[in-house]
Amino acid sequence: MPVAAQKTDIPELSTSVLPGYVIGAMSFIKHLRIKRAYEEPAHDDGVRILVDRLWPRGLSKPRARVDLWLKDLAPSSPLRRWFNHDPARWAEFRRRYARELDAKDRAIAALRGAVRRGRVTLLFSASDPEHNNAVALHAYLARRRTV
């Protein structure tokens, strides 16, 4: 499939990324995107899944066009408050969040079902596009080959 490659901002996915596919060991994560909830919905977003525990501040439900809100995939409130979007805590946040995700089989199964049907966009509300739970969730799924 001759498609131009693009670079990803996710450290675990430092290989080139093709739209819809990650080259090499990550090829099982098909059609999975990450997008800030405040960005305009696009026709090719597929199923839009909010993975935050709290609804994005100031964003109306009609404007967000969220198809599924998987609060159970969000970090626990204590972990979210501890992390406080501090990049210095990113590595430890990801470790702790992965431990929480290990116990969330039902929510992972719901996400898996959506991904198997086609394109999925994980939505987050944090202002930092590189240090947020959607990026950590995507990396977790890639490492565990869960989707």
Question: What residue ranges belong to the model's regions?
Answer:
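Serine residues within intrinsically disordered or low-complexity segments
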Residues: 14-16, 27
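Residues lining hydrophobic/aromatic ligand-binding pockets adjacent to catalytic sites
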Residues: 21-147
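Polybasic, lysine-rich low-complexity intrinsically disordered segments
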Residues: 7-8
